[in-house]
Swiss-Prot record:
Job description of the protein: The glycine cleavage system catalyzes the degradation of glycine. The P protein binds the alpha-amino group of glycine through its pyridoxal phosphate cofactor; CO(2) is released and the remaining methylamine moiety is then transferred to the lipoamide cofactor of the H protein.
Gene3D superfamilies: Aspartate Aminotransferase, domain 1 (3.90.1150.10), Type I PLP-dependent aspartate aminotransferase-like (Major domain) (3.40.640.10)
Domain of life: Bacteria
Catalytic activities: N(6)-[(R)-lipoyl]-L-lysyl-[glycine-cleavage complex H protein] + glycine + H(+) = N(6)-[(R)-S(8)-aminomethyldihydrolipoyl]-L-lysyl-[glycine-cleavage complex H protein] + CO2
Enzyme nomenclature, EC number: 1.4.4.2
Alphabetical GO biological process terms: glycine decarboxylation via glycine cleavage system
Protein name: Glycine dehydrogenase (decarboxylating)
Length: 962
């Protein structure tokens, strides 16, 4: 036996071997099958030589898990997590451990995908429905979305909705009260500029002086003041103004709802419902509107429908509003949202129940009363006369107070005009109030918390005016009143989890979604308090660990992409598209070319591309694709020439959405550049580029990167995501800035695209760990293995299904498209039938009907083993045999295992099942693998039409759950 070297024994590549699914023997067998000698040989056969990198990445060597954890622990320790009283939309919260352990840290929840296949997603759909119910109850409005990205972007969406639905069609002014959070105003101004709206900022009561299509107010405002807007809202609505309100979710537990005051739209952050601050995110935003505006709502909405048996079933409702269908005509470009965080917030409400939430909110308000009473007793002047949790103070020696605060390791809010703000939260204790007295007043103030509390109890408090105290009940549905013990809560979460298929059960081969392993070691640091509990507006010298992590990650991404700079701020891929297009737009404006507003987009593009272009104020011109799925160069040349004087950019995905490396990609870039345009290369398929080629090397100017695809952040059932953009040097001055945090970059003066300066910074440690552990060679091998897995699946399935597009040497890139249209024509079996039948085999369906209707797009990723790939292939082969029985007439078109899929326990218990032309075993145990490890769909096929015609988006009677 040959002795191993010490380097081999140290196993620095162990994580790589665990991340990549096929072991060396499996890889060789697969290479032999596809006809390649090695991964390098296969790469040479697939990737055009003209765009292949000649040098390896300069990330460094791979490292072991323990080494990686030790390094990032050192970064975490550099963060100084002071007690935060900054507020401004971000607050300390206590994450219930039953939720932390069973949801946030549970792959059954965080590795699932957006519930496009609702029959195998009923658990998280119920949790999201609960989130919508919480949102509706607290805001007093009719219809809630399943989550938006953050409060500031929700404000921008509210402005867009207001313009769509306002009857004041000639108005072009959107009014923003001057006491909203500054980051919200920043994002709204950025979006308004793209739309050509005028934003007027002023005192709330001056809104009536303008001809408006919409207006935005903060409740409670940035200084803590609570205002009764009832009369103002009535006046504005009489003038056809759409009234939108940014509201604090915890305050709404005690306060009169904005809906009851007359608001049309209410939104805000659900962060303080059990989601850590995370240096800015991720957090779910709630968004609620009147029923009359339902068709103009942004984002996903969960609705109640029925399945084939007539039983209650949940699904995503009114999808025809969304980008994947309406493209540039969509209400918004929202794709990935914040479902995992919305679920956490909904479980927080379920666990505490209405009484628990009232206790928490009342405690926060009582501490604010005590703080205010003590300060006023000592002659301190307050800016606000009413409050829920925030006290704003004037007349203090700001420098002295700040010095004492820093010495006590606390952060207060310091405004430019000398106002000092203190925002309390769920984590506030008596000792914190005592410490605040010391910091604000200095020593020997003589104030006693207990005495002040007794005074308030005996005399009462007017911090919340009687007219603004909530009178109506909230969360009266039984779901919010029966799970207050941890035992019941744990079982409820588990019961919902068991209804959903996630990566911890089987491969999810969704094309263009890159459902790879989200390793436990990558997830671990996200829960650490040093990362989780930092306020995004903390002084940067307290966030040295975060800033170093962001700088290192940015440097790696620059190297991987071939760009010159990276902006981390966008908190989804679609937001990254928007941010990248804004950089292009501002670049043209800086050169006196503001008229360049046409965006060329191939007809095969992701739906977010045209939606984002529209969002950035661009006009979309669609270019054709040829029969091989490539961009039609002649059509591109013609259209680029036709619009040359106004050409802004092209948006193109690489490898293409058809799953091939287009040989002409550099020529495409050259054509656009020759006509004065910029090249936006969509990073959705970056998993086929890393280490082999790069957007910058190809010739692109800007790309977004889906960190929740290529770089291992989990999809969370529909979010969180991160969409940082890489840019060439000439675009770097035009990426997003931030009004609150300015780290000293040339782009600081630009408007923001997200509420927090670094977006959802709390999940960046995942991608940092992924890159650190894999190193240069590991990243490259991951890409090569993704190519191997895709070509293995393609070649195996090509014996049974037509493969629609192939590139050079008859290869595909990291995904393949099988064409079901001939089978549908011959048998009547649809792509939907096949997708639902895969549920019976224990699989989530591949991407349906994108980029070509009547097809399935399969992306296996590098993390799936040959064993799992073969299981999926066997399922598809078995389904093909089932289709043959329909073709031959053995099974009727309208009564067969595909048409009736998915099958549930209720099916096999049904005495009438015997009338079907196939057995119970064929229905639910169609393969040997399923017999030993069965996933049971809990509902039959859902009636989409019924759900949209009978729209109901709230919790249903408890009897329907039982």
């Amino acid at each position: 036996m040959t002795k191993q070297t010490l380097t081999q024994l140290e196993q620095h590549d162990l994580f790589l071997r665990r991340h990549i699914g096929p072991d060396s023997n499996q890889q060789q067998a697969m290479l032999n099958f596809v006809g390649a000698e090695s991964l390098e040989d296969l790469t040479a056969q697939i990737v055009p030589e003209s765009i292949r990198l000649s040098q390896d990445l300069s990330i460094g060597d791979s490292c072991g898990e323990a080494e990686g954890i030790a390094y990032i622990r050192g970064l975490a320790d550099q963060n100084q997590v002071f007690k935060s009283y900054i507020g401004m939309g971000y607050y300390g919260t206590q994450v219930p451990n039953v939720i932390l352990r069973n949801v946030f840290e549970n792959p059954g929840w965080y590795t699932a995908y957006t519930p496009y296949q609702p029959e195998i997603a009923q658990g998280r759909l119920e949790a999201i429905l609960n989130f919508q119910q919480v949102s509706m109850d607290l805001t007093g409005l009719d219809l809630a979305s399943a989550s938006l990205l953050d409060e500031a972007t929700a404000a921008a969406e509210a402005m867009a909705l207001a313009k769509r639905v306002s009857k004041a069609k000639k108005a072009n002014i959107f009014f923003v009260a001057d006491d909203v959070f500054p980051q919200t105003l920043d994002v709204v101004k950025t979006r308004a500029e793209c739309f050509g709206f005028e934003v007027v900022v002023g005192p709330a009561n001056e809104a009536v002086n303008y001809e408006l299509f919409g207006a935005l107010f903060q409740y409670t405002n940035r200084f803590g003041q609570i205002t009764d807007f009832t009369e103002l809202f009535a006046t504005l609505r009489a003038k056809n103004v759409i009234v939108t309100v940014a509201a604090d979710i915890m305050s709404l537990v005690l306060l009169k709802s904005p809906g009851s005051m007359g608001a049309d739209v209410v939104f805000g952050s659900a962060q303080r419902f059990g989601v850590p601050m995370g240096f800015g995110g991720p957090h779910a935003a709630f968004f609620v509107a009147r029923d009359e505006h339902k068709r103009s709502m942004p984002g996903r909405i969960i609705g109640v429908s029925k399945d084939a048996r007539g039983n209650r079933a949940l699904r995503m409702a009114m999808q025809t509003r969304e980008q994947h269908i309406r493209r540039e005509k969509a209400n918004s470009n929202i794709c990935t949202a914040q479902i995992l965080l919305a679920n956490m917030a909904s479980f927080y409400a379920v666990f505490h129940g209405p009484d628990g939430l009232k206790t928490i909110a009342s405690r926060i308000n009582r501490f604010a009363d005590i703080l205010a009473a003590g300060l006023q007793a000592k002659g301190v002047s307050l800016v606000n006369s009413t409050w829920f949790d925030t006290i704003s103070i004037k007349g203090l020696d700001v420098a002295a107070v700040n010095a004492r605060a820093l010495a006590a390791e606390m952060n207060l809010r310091f405004d430019a005009d000398g106002t000092v703000g203190v925002s309390l939260d769920e984590t506030t204790l008596r000792t914190d109030i005592e410490a605040l007295f010391d910091v604000i007043l200095g020593a020997d103030h003589g104030l006693d918390v207990a005495a002040l509390d007794a005074q308030i109890v005996s005399q009462g408090s007017q911090s919340i005016p009687a007219a603004l105290v909530r009178q109506d009940a909230i969360l009266s549905h039984p779901t919010f009143n029966r799970y207050q013990s941890e035992t019941e809560m744990m079982r409820y979460i588990k019961r919902l989890e068991s209804k959903d298929l996630a990566l911890n059960y089987s491969m999810i081969s969704l094309g263009s979604c890159t459902m790879k392993l989200n390793a436990a070691v990558e997830m671990l640091p996200v829960s650490w308090p040093e990362f989780a509990n930092m306020h995004p507006f903390s002084p940067l010298d307290q966030a040295k660990g975060y800033t170093q992590l962001i700088e290192e990650l940015s440097t790696w991404l620059v190297n991987i992409t071939g760009y010159d700079a990276v902006c981390i701020q966008p908190n989804s891929g679609a937001q990254g598209e928007y941010a990248g297009l804004l950089a292009i737009k501002k670049y043209h404006e800086s050169r006196g070319d503001a008229h360049r507003n046409i965006c060329l987009i191939p007809q095969s593009a992701h739906g977010t591309n045209p939606a984002s272009a529209q969002l950035a104020g661009m006009q979309v011109v669609v270019t054709a694709c040829d029969k091989q799925g490539n961009v039609d160069l002649e059509d591109l040349k013609t259209k680029a020439a036709e619009v040359a004087g106004n050409l802004s950019c092209i948006m193109i995905t690489y490898p293409s959405t058809h799953g091939v490396y287009e040989e002409s990609i550099r020529e495409i870039c050259d054509i656009v550049h020759q006509h004065g345009g910029q090249v936006y290369l969509d990073g959705a398929n970056m998993n086929a580029q890393v280490g082999l080629t790069s957007p910058g090397f190809i010739g692109a100017d800007v790309s977004h990167l889906n960190l929740h695809k290529t770089f291992a952040i989990p999809h969370g059932g529909g979010g969180p995501g991160m969409g940082p953009i890489g840019v060439k040097s000439h675009l770097a001055p035009f990426v997003a800035g931030h009004v609150v945090v300015k780290p000293g970059r040339e782009s600081d003066h630009n408007g923001a695209v997200s509420a927090a300066p670094y977006g959802s910074a709390g999940i960046l440690p995942i991608s940092w760990m992924y890159i650190k552990l894999l190193g240069s060679q590991g990243l490259k091998k991951s890409t090569q293995t993704a190519l191997l897995n895709a070509n293995y699946v393609m070649k195996k399935l090509s014996e049974h299904y037509p493969v629609l597009f192939r590139g050079r040497n008859d290869r595909v890139a990291h995904e393949c498209i099988i064409d079901l249209r001939p089978l549908k024509e011959a048998s009547g079996v649809t792509e939907m039938d096949i997708a639902k039948r895969l549920n019976d085999y224990g699989f989530h369906a591949p991407t349906m009907s994108f980029p070509v209707a009547g097809t399935l797009m399969i992306e296996p990723t590098e993390s799936e083993s040959k064993v799992e790939l073969d299981r999926f292939i066997d399922a598809m082969v078995s389904i093909r045999a089932e289709i043959a029985k329909v073709e031959s007439g053995e099974w009727p078109v309208d009564n067969n295992p595909l048409h009736n899929a998915p099958h549930t326990m209720a099916d096999i218990m049904d005495p009438e099942f015997d009338t079907r032309p196939y057995s119970r075993e064929v229905a639910v145990f169609p393969s040997a693998a399923v017999r030993t490890n069965k996933f049971w769909p809990t509902v039959n096929r859902i009636d989409d039409v019924y759900g949209d015609r009978n729209l109901f988006c709230a919790c249903v009677p408890l009897s329907d759950y039982e």
